Amino acid sequence: MGSRFFLALFLVILMLGNEVQGNQEDDSGSLALLGTVQGSLLSYWTSAKEVAKDLYQKTYPISMDEKLRDMYSKSSAAMSTYAGIFTDQLLTLLRGE
């Protein structure tokens, strides 16, 4: 998300810089260069997004799913153990033994 902010800020500064310069001669070479730079930045951003998305989809379901299942089984086993101990203590207290 930070990269999007910096890219947007860069484009806003670029547009403000063009407004400050006023109506000077439009050099078709500079416009072509600007279009090329914008196109390459957009293609780089799109490819980086796709690579990150693919990497996330490859790594998340395998490792994170196993870790979450393991944490759930360990925590539910611990909770059932402590619930049993609490129940035994409560019954002993109520019976008065």
Curated annotation (Swiss-Prot):
Adult and fetal liver, intestine and peritoneal macrophages. Residues 1-22 form the signal peptide. Residues 75-97 are annotated as: Lipoprotein lipase cofactor. One of its GO terms (biological process) is positive regulation of triglyceride catabolic process. Pfam families: Apo-CII (PF05355). Residues 63-71 are annotated as: Lipid binding. GO terms for molecular function: lipase inhibitor activity; lipid binding; lipoprotein lipase activator activity; phospholipase activator activity; phospholipase binding. GO terms for cellular component: chylomicron; cytosol; extracellular region; intermediate-density lipoprotein particle; low-density lipoprotein particle; spherical high-density lipoprotein particle; very-low-density lipoprotein particle. InterPro entries: Apo-CII, ApoC-II_dom_sf. Component of chylomicrons, very low-density lipoproteins (VLDL), low-density lipoproteins (LDL), and high-density lipoproteins (HDL) in plasma. Plays an important role in lipoprotein metabolism as an activator of lipoprotein lipase. Belongs to the apolipoprotein C2 family. This is Apolipoprotein C-II. It comes from Mus musculus (Mouse). The gene is Apoc2.
